[in-house]
A protein has these predicted regions:
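Residue(s) in the substrate-gating loop at a strand-loop-helix junction
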Residues: 134
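Substrate-binding pocket helix/loop in short-chain dehydrogenase/reductase
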Residues: 90-91, 95-100
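The beta1-alpha1 cofactor-binding region of Rossmann-like NAD(H)/NADP(H)-dependent oxidoreductases
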Residues: 35, 52-64, 96
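Active-site helix of classical SDR
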Residues: 114, 150
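C-terminal helical subdomain
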Residues: 174-175, 190, 194-203
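Canonical Rossmann dinucleotide-binding motif of NAD(H)/NADP(H)-dependent dehydrogenases/reductases
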Residues: 1-28
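Active-site-adjacent segment of SDR/Rossmann-fold oxidoreductases
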Residues: 139, 160-170
Length: 203
């Protein structure tokens, strides 16, 4: 039975991914900084779902989560780096701490996940990494400067590792949707997104 670990899986896109792969018969790891919500989803899904605590910006947290998951699932076949945050508004009106936090979660979180998961992925019967990027990785976006920059970085990490990890037979892929109607974007202040409209949902 194949397995998948999803970061930021307690709600939104991560929860939708967890539900989809559970329906496909996978062992599903629902890891999130909000453990109670992750556990609630795991309980709803059933015995092939497992919840755990994960702060993606903390490398040690990744090491603990991966060890916990692989002890439960047996191996790691698919890693989904989904966790991400977004601050919207004029660049100069956004506190520098918010810009730094965006990069720590959205970029360092992916670096930490890929780096710490590699030993487990190399041992698996087959292995894939899926990084959640964004259409903002293709063009810079006003009012979303640090978010857009972080997704450019994720795109670069993905393309580079997909080439580099061919030697391990590990594919590294990304998904670059337009903005999806989730809690993360509900209160965002970005005129460009409002003009385009948000037409995707997790349903």
């Amino acid at each position: 039975m194949h397995s998948i670990l999803i970061s930021g899986a307690a709600q939104g896109i991560g929860a939708a991914i967890a539900q989809l792969f559970y329906q496909q018969g996978y062992r599903v790891g629902i890891y999130d900084i909000h453990l109670a919500q992750a556990q609630q989803l795991a309980d709803q899904l059933g015995e092939r779902a497992h919840a755990g605590l994960l702060d993606v910006a903390d490398y040690a947290s990744w090491q603990t989560a991966l060890s916990d998951f692989c002890q439960w699932a047996g191996e790691l076949n698919i890693l989904v780096n989904n966790a991400g945050i977004l601050y919207s508004g004029a660049f100069e009106n956004t506190p520098i701490e918010a810009h730094h936090r965006t990069m720590a979660v959205n970029v360092n979180g992916v670096l930490n996940g890929c780096h710490s998961a590699l030993p487990y992925l190399k041992q698996a019967s087959f292995a894939r990494v899926i990084n959640l990027s964004s259409a903002s990785a293709i063009y810079g976006q006003a009012d979303l400067i640090s978010y857009s920059a972080s997704k450019f970085a994720v795109r670069g990490i993905t393309e580079g590792l997909d080439i580099e990890w061919q030697k391990y037979d590990i594919r590294v892929l990304d998904v670059m949707p337009l903005f999806v109607q989730t809690a993360m974007v509900k209160d965002m202040d970005a005129a460009t997104i409002q003009n385009m409209g948000v037409h995707l949902s997790t349903e």
